[in-house]
Amino acid sequence: MSRSRINGNFIDKTSSIVANILLRIIPTTSGEKEAFTYYRDGMSAQSEGNYAEALQNYYEATRPEIDPYDRSYILYNIGLIHTSNGEHTKALEYYFRALERNPFLPQAFNNMAVICHYRGEQAIRQGDSEIAEAWSDQAAEYWKQAIALTPGNYIEAQNWLKITRRFE
C-alpha cells in the first residue's frame, strides 16, 4: 500500500491528493510517475523517522528516474539519511553523486563540510593534528562552495572560515 494512503496527517493527505492530481494532468512518463511516487513515499517516511523505509523508497525511486536534477534530490536525501545514521562515508558518497548531477546544491556542500569538520574535530581529540588540519581544510573548501552558491546563508560557516583564517 502506498505510504500516502496510510498516513493519517491531514497536511500529508492534502499534499498527496494534490500530487496525485498533478501526476494525472501533467504529461509525464510512467517511469517519472513511478519515481515520484517512491520519492514522495520516501520523504513521508523520512519525516517520520522511518529511515529504513525511506531508504527503500529512495532506492526504488532511482531506478526509473532519469532526469539528473530530480535524481540529484533523491541522492541528496539518501545522503541525509546516512548522515543521520552516522554513516558518514556513505553520506559523502551520496552527496558527491547528487552534486555530479546537480552542482547547484549548496546544502550538499554544507553537509559535506559538516562531516569533514566533525572528522577534523575527532582527529584533534585523538591527537592527530595533521589529519585534523586536512579535514578542516576540506571542510573549508566545501563551505566556500556552499557560500558561493548562496552568499547570504551559512553565517556560522562564514564566521568559522574567518576565525580559522580560511576565508579569502
Swiss-Prot record:
It comes from the Eukaryota. Pfam families: TPR_1. It is found in: Plastid, Chloroplast thylakoid membrane. Belongs to the Ycf3 family. PANTHER family: CELLULOSE SYNTHASE OPERON PROTEIN C, TPR REPEAT-CONTAINING PROTEIN MJ0263. The keyword 4Fe-4S does not apply. The gene is ycf3. Keywords: Chloroplast, Membrane, Photosynthesis, Plastid, Repeat, Thylakoid, TPR repeat. Essential for the assembly of the photosystem I (PSI) complex. May act as a chaperone-like factor to guide the assembly of the PSI subunits. It comes from Illicium oligandrum. This is Photosystem I assembly protein Ycf3. It is a peripheral membrane protein. NCBIfam families: PRK02603.1 (NF002725). The keyword Translocase does not apply. SMART domains: TPR. GO terms for cellular component: chloroplast thylakoid membrane. Coiled coil: none annotated. Its main location: plastid. One of its GO terms (biological process) is photosynthesis. TPR repeats lie at residues 35-68, 72-105, 120-153.
